[in-house]
């Protein structure tokens, strides 16, 4: 089984396109965005969909992907940016657009893990 691991791409994942060897599993272990904007998340998901040289693509959110972490969203936006980047509704839970992406826009080859696991072949 061939596994490729990347992380901390901070919206620069497009620069890796020609450098990834392909294989069975691509794992991105967080910080695929700079601050978790909707446009950043959508761009990353679309990039994952185009990685057809991998059978499975697994990703988790990192500390920069703050819209995935609703409990931190309100506090971090004021600490990091000293201004409002998101509406206060994000502090009450994940933004609706993110829930919609995770529920409806991931194809069968893309797996998002949060407090969970996945078994692929004999690997877990």
Residue ranges and their predicted role:
Residues 1-3:
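Extreme N-terminal starter segment of soluble prokaryotic enzymes
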């Amino acid at each position: 089984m061939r596994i490729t691991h990347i992380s901390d791409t901070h919206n620069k994942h497009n620069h890796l396109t020609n450098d990834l060897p392909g294989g069975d599993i691509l794992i991105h272990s967080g910080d695929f965005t700079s601050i978790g904007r909707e446009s950043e998340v959508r761009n990353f998901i679309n990039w994952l969909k185009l990685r057809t040289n991998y059978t499975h693509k697994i990703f988790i959110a990192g500390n920069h992907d703050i819209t995935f972490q609703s409990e931190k969203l309100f506090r971090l936006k004021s600490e990091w940016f000293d201004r409002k980047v998101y509406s206060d509704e994000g502090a009450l839970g994940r933004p609706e657009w993110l829930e919609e992406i995770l529920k409806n826009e991931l194809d069968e080859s893309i797996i998002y893990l949060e407090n969970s696991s996945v078994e692929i072949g004999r690997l877990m």
